C-alpha cells in the first residue's frame, strides 16, 4: 500500500477544522477551517474572477465580504450543498482525483442513519471513489492511543462525546453527547474579557479570542485556591499582543475560561460536566468492564489541549468512584489530530483491506450498505 497512486485518503471533517491526508502518514497534510463563504453581494469583487464559493483559509482571509457558514454543526453535517469542502480537499489541498483512491471518512457517534447514507452516496456518485469506509471518530482516537478498550472523551469545536469502547466496538447505549465544546469556551472568554474592559465582539475579534484561549488558557487543579492565588499575586498574569500591537494582560481569565468544562453552570448551562458525563457513561456499561474503562480514559480532540486537564479530570473522576477503583486519564500529546492518526493507522492495516465498501457492492445494494459494513 506504500504506492502513492492507490494510497487511501483519510478525511476527518470536524466542526471547526477539516484534517485530510494519506493513510500511512503520521500527520494530516492539509488542515484548514471547515468554513464555506459565499459573496454577500454579487459583483462587489470586480475583476477578481468571481467564484461562487470560497473554502477554508481563503474564506477566512476574505471574510469581510463573505457570508461565512459552517456546514458542520455540533459534529453533524447539516448543509450538504456546502460540503464543497470535500471537493476542495481532494482537488486543491491533496491534489488527487478521488476516483483513484479509497476514502476513509469519519463521523460523529450517534450520527443519523440518513447522514451516513448521504455521505456514502456522495462519495460513490459525485466523486466516483473506488471504495470508501465510514469510521466513528472516538474509535479512531482510541486506536491512535494504542488501545482497543477504553472510554474516549472526544471534544472538538462544536460538540463533545463520551464514548465507551470495548474490544474495538462502541457501546451505543452508553454514549453521551455534550453540547459543550470549544466554541462555548471562546464565547465565555469573550464575555469575561469584556468585564476586564476589552471589547471583543466581531467575528474577526472572535478569532483573536480563540487564539488567546489556545495559547494561554489552562485548567486549575483546585479552582477556589487558584482564584485566591490570582487575587493575591500576579503569578498567573500573562500578556498577549493583539494584531494591532496593543498589549493586553490576562490573569484569572486563563483558568476561569476552561473551568466551564468542570462547572457548566458558570455559563448557565444545565449540562453535566465532562467528568460527570464520563462517569455517567461508564455507569451505563456492564459492571464487569467498568474497571477497564476507568483505567483507560482517553482524551481526544483540540478541545482537550488545555494544560492541566488530565490531572484535574483524574482528580474529579476519582472523587466519584469507590476508593479501590484505579482511575487513569491518558492525554496523548498529539490528541488534536488523534482521530486522523487513528484513521491513518486503520486504513493502512492489511487486515482492513477486506473492510472497504467497494463501488460494486454499492451499485448492488445502494447507500444502505454502509450500515452493514461500517459499525
Curated annotation (Swiss-Prot):
Entry keyword set: ATP-binding, Cytoplasm, Cytoskeleton, Hydrolase, Nucleotide-binding
Gene Ontology CC terms = cytoplasm; cytoskeleton
State the signal peptide span.
none
Intrachain S-S bonds: none
Task: Supply the enzyme class, top level.
Answer: hydrolase
Family that this chain belongs to: Belongs to the actin family.
The protein's name is Actin-1
Q: Which organism is it from?
A: Zea mays
